[in-house]
């Protein structure tokens, strides 16, 4: 069994495309294929919005690695290896940013699972130049193309989706970049959680903050709290910062791979935990979030989360806290509460 994800395996079949190139790897890359690629091209850089992957790849001195929502550093890259992201809007964002940064005559290789919608590259790349499929294997596709047209100027501010949401008497302006959970909408789970929350105090962590809806609402409704917001996704970090700023709020927003960069003295942990990784369901982060939560709380710390009702979270919470209460429930979502004892 290969150590590489299927899109990397199809790229591995076509190594001659990378000969003599300075390659910038971007998108939904999850494995260490970029380290192998070093032997087949002039240089490799990795640009990722995934903090967990960044923590892994940055330990190697074979490649330069960058984490963020915008690639705004000097580079000698003349080819992009794009792992097709699950959100089409994120693919459009990455193409606009990277083609503008690297310019005319930049070559591009695009790899991804067919179910991810990679076929969209055929229309999406037309404004930059020709692109064509050259290989299919493992239910994946391999495209190669070249940017022959002058890309339009790229300004990240143009890519924010801005929308208003109202809860009771509170209203909020939300700023969201492509690739962020619930991009451009107020999801029902978060709404139910906010409607159920008690009065908050002390240091509060919004874990998996997305566009900052939970954290900003909590800060607005509880002006005396010290709000902290974390996410694994760089687009979420930038979006949450923009949401706070748009509403005249302040708080600490930072990247964290579950609890890797958090404090250990939260009075409240509030979350709409993620359970998707790429195109697949992945409960690992949520299980660690719930199971390890007491270690990152004050003596009387409390945790309140929303989850799809079919997810088996109560036993995990019960094991960690020795208690778990359902505060609210619909036919789709449940609000779970636990207190450190």
From Swiss-Prot:
Record bears the keyword Methyltransferase: yes
Cellular localization per UniProt: Cytoplasm
Alphabetized InterPro entries for the sequence: DNA_methylase_N6_adenine_CS, Mtase_sm_N, rRNA_ssu_MeTfrase_C, RsmC/RlmG, SAM-dependent_MTases_sf, Small_mtfrase_dom
A single GO molecular function term of this UniProt record: 16S rRNA (guanine(1207)-N(2))-methyltransferase activity
Presence of the UniProt keyword ATP-binding in the record: no
Keywords associated with the record: Cytoplasm, Methyltransferase, rRNA processing, S-adenosyl-L-methionine, Transferase
Subunit record text: Monomer.
Function field: Specifically methylates the guanine in position 1207 of 16S rRNA in the 30S particle.
Family the UniProt entry places it in: Belongs to the methyltransferase superfamily. RsmC family.
Name the UniProt record assigns to this protein: Ribosomal RNA small subunit methyltransferase C
């Amino acid at each position: 069994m290969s150590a590489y994800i299927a899109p990397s395996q199809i790229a591995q079949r076509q190594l001659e495309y990378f000969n003599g190139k300075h390659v910038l790897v971007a998108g939904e890359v999850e494995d260490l294929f970029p380290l192998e690629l070093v032997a087949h091209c002039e240089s490799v850089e990795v640009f990722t919005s995934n903090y967990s992957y960044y923590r892994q790849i940055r330990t190697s001195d074979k490649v330069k690695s960058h984490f963020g929502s915008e690639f705004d550093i000097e580079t000698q890259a003349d080819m992009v290896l794009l792992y097709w992201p699950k959100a089409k809007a994120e693919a459009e964002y990455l193409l606009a940013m990277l083609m503008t940064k690297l310019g005319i005559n930049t070559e591009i290789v695009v790899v991804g699972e067919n179910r991810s919608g990679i076929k969209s590259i055929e229309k999406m790349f037309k404004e930059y130049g020709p692109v064509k499929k050259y290989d299919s294997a493992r239910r994946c596709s391999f495209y190669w193309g070249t940017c022959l047209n002058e890309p339009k100027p790229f300004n990240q501010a143009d890519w924010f989706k801005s929308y208003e949401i109202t809860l009771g008497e509170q209203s909020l302006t939300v700023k969201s970049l492509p690739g962020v959970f619930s991009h451009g909408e107020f999801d029902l789970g978060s709404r139910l959680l906010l409607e159920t929350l008690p009065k908050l105090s002390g240091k509060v962590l919004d874990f998996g903050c997305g566009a900052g809806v939970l954290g900003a609402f909590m800060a607005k409704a509880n002006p005396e709290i010290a709000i902290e917001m974390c996410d694994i996704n760089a687009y979420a970090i930038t979006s949450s910062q923009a949401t706070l700023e748009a509403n005249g709020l302040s708080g600490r927003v930072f990247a964290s791979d579950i609890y890797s960069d958090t404090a250990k003295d939260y009075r409240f942990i509030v979350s709409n935990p993620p359970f998707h990784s790429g195109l697949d369901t992945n409960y690992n982060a949520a299980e660690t979030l719930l199971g390890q939560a007491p270690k990152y709380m004050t003596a009387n710390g409390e945790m309140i989360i929303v989850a799809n009702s079919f997810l088996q979270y109560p036993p995990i919470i019960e094991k960690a806290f020795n208690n778990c209460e359902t505060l609210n429930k619909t036919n789709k979502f449940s609000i779970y509460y636990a207190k450190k004892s």
